[in-house]
From Swiss-Prot:
Similarity comment text for this entry: Belongs to the ferredoxin--NADP reductase type 2 family.
Enzyme class: oxidoreductase
InterPro entries (alphabetical): FAD/NAD-bd_sf, FAD/NAD-binding_dom, Fd--NADP_Rdtase_type_2, Ferredoxin-NADP_redctase_2
Presence of the UniProt keyword NADP in the record: yes
Name this protein carries in UniProt: Ferredoxin--NADP reductase
List of residues binding FAD: E34, Q42, Y47, V87, F121, D285, T325
Alphabetical list of Pfam families matching this protein: Pyr_redox_2
Keyword Protein biosynthesis among UniProt keywords: no
Amino acid sequence: MSAEYDLTIIGGGPVGMFAAFYAGMRNARVQLLESLPELGGQVQALYPEKIIHDVAGYPAIKGRELVAQLEKQLTQFPIDIQLASPVTDVTGAMGDFTITTASGQQSHSKAIIVATGSGAFEPRRLAVDNAAEFENKQLFYHIPSVKQFADRTVLVAGGGDSAIDMALMLEPVAKHVYIMHRRDRFRGMEHNVDLLKASSVEIKTPFLIKQLAETATGQLQLTMKEVRGTTEETLAVDDLIVNYGFIADNKVIRNWHVTPTMAHRLITVDTEMNTDVPGIAAIGDTVTYAGKLGLIASGFGEAPNAVNQLMMTLYPERRSPLHSTTVFEKM
């Protein structure tokens, strides 16, 4: 049986979407499989309102807007997109891989690019006994829109770029914003930290939340304890947003019959994004190699590399890739 697709991209986050588009430019028969009901991966599911500053050509763009632009880019080619289709198994070999999804549907592909990001993800939850009582009421781990916090007092817990970005996004919308971190120094990029310090966001360091309670007026009362100290403070807020990061795992890949070698839950690749399984490449946050940066911008560079090396392996008689202007002049 001949393979239905030249390339199957497993993972429909921004990097997987760009890989599918670029494969379309190479006239490949492309399938894009995404486990979630919509494209965009973690950016769409967790950070739709986050302002992204490190994508070339965009001084600033919201996560959802970046995904929308990538979707628009995809429509230029006949990409077969399958949503809500987590891949449960891969069998076969280069030239005819069989890919099985959770619904039992099978497809055949000559080669595969894995772009599953960090895999399945769960937020690192607040380690307070009664925290679950307040989840999705006054305690949030990710939010669909900052508008829900208009004219409210909000505390953001966390010390990385995501927490800082969230606090800065809330600043013009909320009545008052606090940010609390367990260390005196934030882990975010220097420019973001400078913006935070220059903003009206009130900084609480070095503190950890120890207790949650509801006040008589319906607010959320936080009891905060100084790290390596004895000071305790209480603070009443309308909402608490916890940005402690996510616990991610690509364990589903380890259950495939054809499994690339992994190191610390990430797939190891060479300079051409090849795994140790012929015909399977991997890109984005799912991979590790010397000098790897966990940036969307890095993944956008890895995608054409992976597509080109697989297409040249499958179709050595084809010409080397052309510049995009040449491709679109013919359309």
